[in-house]
Protein backbone atom coordinates (compact mmCIF):
# COMPACT_ATOMS: atom_id res chain seq x y z
CA UNK A 1 0.00 0.00 0.00
CA UNK A 2 0.90 3.67 -0.23
CA UNK A 3 3.37 4.94 2.33
CA UNK A 4 4.39 1.48 3.49
CA UNK A 5 7.77 1.09 5.14
CA UNK A 6 9.59 -1.78 6.79
CA UNK A 7 8.20 -2.47 10.26
CA UNK A 8 9.33 -4.79 13.06
CA UNK A 9 7.04 -6.57 15.52
CA UNK A 10 8.90 -6.76 18.84
CA UNK A 11 6.55 -9.43 20.17
CA UNK A 12 7.41 -12.04 17.54
CA UNK A 13 10.59 -10.64 15.96
CA UNK A 14 8.98 -10.47 12.51
CA UNK A 15 9.45 -7.85 9.81
CA UNK A 16 6.56 -6.68 7.65
CA UNK A 17 5.57 -3.78 5.40
CA UNK A 18 3.02 -1.29 6.75
CA UNK A 19 2.60 2.32 7.85
CA UNK A 20 2.11 4.01 11.21
CA UNK A 21 -1.36 5.05 10.02
CA UNK A 22 -2.37 1.48 9.14
CA UNK A 23 -1.08 0.16 12.47
CA UNK A 24 -2.94 2.89 14.41
CA UNK A 25 -6.10 2.10 12.43
CA UNK A 26 -5.78 -1.58 13.41
CA UNK A 27 -5.27 -0.57 17.06
CA UNK A 28 -8.42 1.58 16.90
CA UNK A 29 -10.41 -1.32 15.41
CA UNK A 30 -9.26 -3.69 18.16
CA UNK A 31 -10.03 -1.15 20.91
CA UNK A 32 -13.46 -0.41 19.41
CA UNK A 33 -14.18 -4.14 19.46
CA UNK A 34 -12.90 -4.43 23.05
CA UNK A 35 -15.30 -1.70 24.19
CA UNK A 36 -18.33 -2.87 22.21
CA UNK A 37 -18.01 -6.60 21.49
CA UNK A 38 -15.62 -8.26 23.91
CA UNK A 39 -12.13 -9.75 24.09
CA UNK A 40 -9.79 -9.70 21.09
CA UNK A 41 -6.77 -11.90 20.38
CA UNK A 42 -3.31 -10.82 19.33
CA UNK A 43 -3.99 -12.90 16.19
CA UNK A 44 -6.91 -10.59 15.32
CA UNK A 45 -4.53 -7.60 15.44
CA UNK A 46 -1.95 -9.42 13.34
CA UNK A 47 -4.65 -10.18 10.76
CA UNK A 48 -5.49 -6.48 10.50
CA UNK A 49 -1.85 -5.55 9.80
CA UNK A 50 -1.26 -8.44 7.39
CA UNK A 51 0.82 -10.73 9.60
CA UNK A 52 -0.05 -14.43 9.93
CA UNK A 53 -1.16 -15.64 13.35
CA UNK A 54 1.25 -17.67 15.46
CA UNK A 55 0.49 -20.39 18.00
CA UNK A 56 1.37 -17.83 20.70
CA UNK A 57 -0.79 -15.06 19.25
CA UNK A 58 -3.90 -17.25 19.44
CA UNK A 59 -3.34 -17.63 23.19
CA UNK A 60 -2.79 -13.93 24.01
CA UNK A 61 -5.06 -10.91 23.80
CA UNK A 62 -6.86 -8.09 25.54
CA UNK A 63 -10.21 -7.57 27.20
CA UNK A 64 -12.21 -4.51 28.21
CA UNK A 65 -10.16 -4.19 31.43
CA UNK A 66 -7.08 -3.16 29.40
CA UNK A 67 -7.21 -1.49 26.01
CA UNK A 68 -4.48 -2.20 23.48
CA UNK A 69 -1.76 0.47 23.47
CA UNK A 70 0.96 0.29 20.82
CA UNK A 71 4.31 2.01 21.26
CA UNK A 72 6.34 3.05 18.23
CA UNK A 73 10.11 3.38 18.03
CA UNK A 74 12.74 2.90 15.35
CA UNK A 75 15.29 0.16 14.85
CA UNK A 76 17.54 -1.21 12.13
CA UNK A 77 16.95 -4.43 10.23
CA UNK A 78 19.81 -6.96 10.04
CA UNK A 79 20.50 -5.51 6.56
CA UNK A 80 20.88 -2.02 8.03
CA UNK A 81 17.53 -0.72 6.79
CA UNK A 82 15.74 1.66 9.19
CA UNK A 83 12.34 0.43 10.27
CA UNK A 84 9.47 1.25 12.59
CA UNK A 85 9.37 -1.03 15.63
CA UNK A 86 6.06 -1.73 17.33
CA UNK A 87 5.56 -3.04 20.83
CA UNK A 88 2.79 -2.97 23.38
CA UNK A 89 2.65 -0.63 26.37
CA UNK A 90 0.32 -3.23 27.89
CA UNK A 91 1.38 -6.70 26.83
CA UNK A 92 -1.38 -9.02 25.66
CA UNK A 93 -2.29 -11.48 28.37
CA UNK A 94 -3.16 -15.20 28.49
CA UNK A 95 -6.78 -16.04 29.39
CA UNK A 96 -7.76 -12.62 28.01
CA UNK A 97 -11.30 -13.89 27.41
CA UNK A 98 -11.85 -13.99 31.18
CA UNK A 99 -12.84 -10.63 32.63
CA UNK A 100 -12.67 -11.43 36.34
Residue ranges with predicted function:
Residues 1-100:
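Long, helix-rich, hydrophobic modules that act as membrane-proximal anchors or helical bundle/coiled-coil regulators
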Amino acid sequence: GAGEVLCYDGMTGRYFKSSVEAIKKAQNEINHSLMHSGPESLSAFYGLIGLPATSMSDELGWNSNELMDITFSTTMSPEGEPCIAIDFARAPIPHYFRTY
